[in-house]
C-alpha cells in the first residue's frame, strides 16, 4: 500500500469513528486560526486550471512573466500542468514523486524527478530549496502546486520565507485538517499556515470530497479533512474584499462518486 492510499485509509478510519488521539485544542485558538485563513476576493479574478474534477484548481488570473511551475506529488493525470503550459509561453514544469516511475505526460516542458519533497535531502527526499536551486537560475516569479499527502506541513515550516516569496501563486492540498482539534497537531499545522501567511493571502478554498468520511465536527465547527487552498503573494493584491458565498461558480467536485462538500460558512463569513 503506497503512502497516498495508507494516508487515506487512516483518515477515513479516524473520521468514521471520530477518533481523537491527543488532548483537544482550545476552541478559541482554532477559531482564531480559521479567521486568518478566510479567503478574500482580490483585483485578480479566479480561473480554473486543469481538469473538471480532481487535478483542477482555481487560481488568480495573474500569470504574466511566470517562468516555472514546481509540482510535487504526481497522480495519473497532469491536467493542471498541461493547461498552464498552454497558457504561459515558455513555462517549464518540474514534477517530483518517489512513488511513481514517470510523469503521466510527456512534453518538452516537463521535467520529472523520482523523489519526494520533504524537510531533508537524501537519496529519497529533497528540500524545496535544493530542488529549485538545481532546476532554475531564473529570478522571475514561480508557481507552486503541492499535493504531497501530509508532508506539506514540514515542507512549509522548513522553507525560508525568502524562498516562499519566489512563488507568486501557491496551491496546496492540505491533509488531515480534522486533527486541528488535537493540541499537538494544531501546533504543527498552525505553524505551517502562519509561515505562508507572512508572504501570501488565501484567495480560495475548496474541500476535497474524495475522503469518504468528510469532516470532523467539533464544538459547532466543521473541519473537512482535506482542502485545497490557493494563495496569492501579498504584493500582487491591490484591492480586496470579503467573499460572501461559496462554492465559486468554477468549483467542481474532486470525485463524481459522491456529492461535493460545500465549504462551511464560518470558513469565509
Model-identified regions with their sequence ranges:
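Conserved acidic residues
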Residues: 115-119, 147
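Switch II (G3) loop of P-loop NTPases
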Residues: 144-151
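Rossmann-like AdoMet/SAM-dependent catalytic core
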Residues: 3-63, 67-70, 77, 113-114, ...
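Short, polar loop motifs at secondary-structure junctions
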Residues: 95-103
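Short, conserved active-site loop motifs that form the nucleotide-linked donor/cofactor pocket
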Residues: 109-110, 142
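Conserved beta-strand signature within the Rossmann-like core of class I S-adenosyl-L-methionine
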Residues: 166-177
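Conserved SAM-binding loop of SAM-dependent methyltransferases across substrates and taxa
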Residues: 76-88
